[in-house]
Design a protein with these regions (language model features):
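Flexible, glycine-rich active-site loops centered on histidine and acidic residues
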Residues: 2-22, 83-149, 193-195, 200-206, ...
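An alpha-helical appendage that flanks or caps ligand/catalytic pockets
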Residues: 5-7, 125-162, 203-306, 332-339
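Acidic (Asp/Glu)-rich catalytic clusters
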Residues: 35-36, 62-71, 93, 97-104, ...
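Conserved, mostly hydrophobic/aromatic
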Residues: 38, 46, 65, 96, ...
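Alpha-helix-loop-beta-strand connector modules within alpha/beta enzyme cores
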Residues: 52-76, 130-134, 324-338
Length: 339
C-alpha cells in the first residue's frame, strides 16, 4: 500500500499578541516530518470564508512545503476550478511543478459549499459548466507551445502562450474529487485519477472503486489501484473515553462544515453532504483506535480495493508517527491480485 497525508492548517485571528502564522508554520513542519517518516504525498484543501482559518491560498502554502522537502508529492485536494481564472491557475500550478522538480499532483473539483460560491458572487448552478470549461483551458494551457485562443461561455483568451511550462509532461497528474456514480464515470472518461472523501463507510468506498475500475477497463485501459486515493481520519491509541471525545469532535466539525455548505433551500446534492451526523457514521469513515484496531480497519479497506490512503491525523503529529511506525509496516507489500 501507499500512504500520504491530507489536511489543512489554521491561521488564528487576534490582536498583535496573536501569532497568526504559527498554525501555517507548524503545518509545514508537519509535512517535513511526514516525508521523513516515509509518507508519499501531502494533499491540501482549498476553502474560503469559513471564519475558522482554513487554507485559502493552497498553492502558496504548498510552494513553501515544496521548498522544505525533496520527495514528498505536493497535492491539491482540491482546487475548486469555478472560482479561478484558469490561465492564471495554470501558470501558478506550473510554477510549483517546476520549482519542486515535478512533484505536483493537481487535484480539482467543482465545489459544494454554498457560502463559498455566494462569497465569490457565483451561482452554484454554474459550477459544473465553469468546471468543465476551466479544466479544458488549463489542459490546453499546459500542452500548447504556440499561441492559442479560447472563446467560451465564461472565459475568453486571445493569442496566449502560458508560461512557464510544467516539469511533468504532458502535464502534472490530474486528480478529481468525486463520489456520485455520474461523477466517478466522468473521472474515468477524462482519464484522471480519483480522490475519494474521508467520510464514506468502507462498503461505499468499495462500490466506488469497483465502479471506477469497471469504467477504466471498459475503455480498454489497465486499472492501476494507485490511481485511487482514499482519505481517512486517523487517531492512534485511545481509551474508550478518548475515542468517544474524538468522534464527538469529528461530528461537530461535520455539522459546522455542513452549515457552511448548505444552500438556503436546503437542496445540496453533493455526495459529501449525504452522510449522517452520528457517532456511528463518524467511526465508520475513520481509523480510530489502537494500532491493531486501525490495522484491522485498514485491511478491510484494502479488501475492497483501496491501495492508496491519505491520512488526516486527528491525533496530531504523534498519531502520524505511530501510524507510520506501528501500522504501515504490515501493509508495505504488493497489493493482492483481484479478479
Amino acid at each position: 500500500m501507499r500512504f500520504g497525508i491530507f489536511g489543512s492548517a489554521q491561521a488564528k485571528r487576534g490582536g498583535p499578541d496573536v501569532d497568526s502564522g504559527a498554525g501555517f508554520r507548524d503545518f509545514v513542519e508537519h509535512n517535513v516530518e511526514a516525508e521523513a517518516l516515509g509518507y508519499h504525498s501531502s494533499f491540501v484543501v482549498e476553502h474560503h470564508f469559513t471564519g475558522f482559518g482554513q487554507i485559502s491560498a493552497t498553492l502558496n502554502l504548498l510552494t513553501w512545503v515544496g521548498a522544505r522537502t525533496t520527495t514528498l508529492r505536493l497535492g491539491t485536494a482540491v482546487m475548486t476550478l469555478p472560482w479561478h481564472n484558469p490561465v492564471l491557475l495554470a501558470e501558478q500550478a506550473a510554477t510549483i511543478d517546476l520549482l519542486s522538480g515535478g512533484r505536483l499532483d493537481f487535484g480539482v473539483g467543482q465545489g459544494y459549499r454554498h457560502n463559498e460560491f455566494a462569497g465569490f458572487c457565483l451561482p452554484m448552478e454554474e459550477a459544473e459548466g465553469r468546471f468543465e470549461e476551466s479544466l479544458g483551458v488549463i489542459i490546453k494551457a499546459w500542452t500548447s507551445d504556440t499561441p492559442w485562443s479560447h472563446h467560451g461561455k465564461h472565459w475568453r483568451f486571445e493569442g496566449v502562450v502560458v508560461e512557464p511550462p510544467t516539469a511533468q509532461k504532458p502535464h502534472p497528474p490530474i486528480w478529481m474529487g468525486a463520489g456520485r456514480p455520474a461523477s466517478i464515470k466522468k473521472v474515468a472518461a477524462h482519464g484522471f485519477n480519483l480522490l475519494l472523501d474521508q467520510f464514506a463507510p468502507i462498503d461505499q468506498i468499495g462500490e466506488r472503486i469497483a465502479l471506477f475500475r469497471s469504467e477504466v477497463e471498459g475503455r480498454g485501459c489497465v486499472f492501476d489501484p494507485m490511481r485511487v486515493a482514499v482519505t481517512r481520519s486517523v487517531h492512534v491509541s485511545m481509551t474508550a473515553a478518548e475515542r468517544e471525545k474524538a468522534l464527538q469532535t469529528r461530528v461537530a466539525a461535520r455539522q459546522r462544515m455542513d452549515r457552511l455548505a448548505q444552500r438556503p433551500d436546503g437542496q445540496n446534492r453533493a455526495s459529501i453532504m449525504s452522510y449522517a451526523h452520528t457517532l456511528e457514521a463518524a467511526e465508520a469513515g475513520a481509523l480510530y483506535g489502537t494500532p491493531d484496531e486501525i490495522a484491522a480497519k485498514l485491511q478491510m479497506l484494502r479488501d475492497v480495493g483501496a491501495e492508496y490512503v491519505l491520512v488526516n491525523s486527528a491525533g496530531g503529529r504523534e498519531s502520524l508517527r505511530r501510524f507510520a511506525r506501528e501500522v504501515v509496516p504490515a501493509f508495505s507489500g504488493e497489493p493482492a491480485l483481484r479478479s
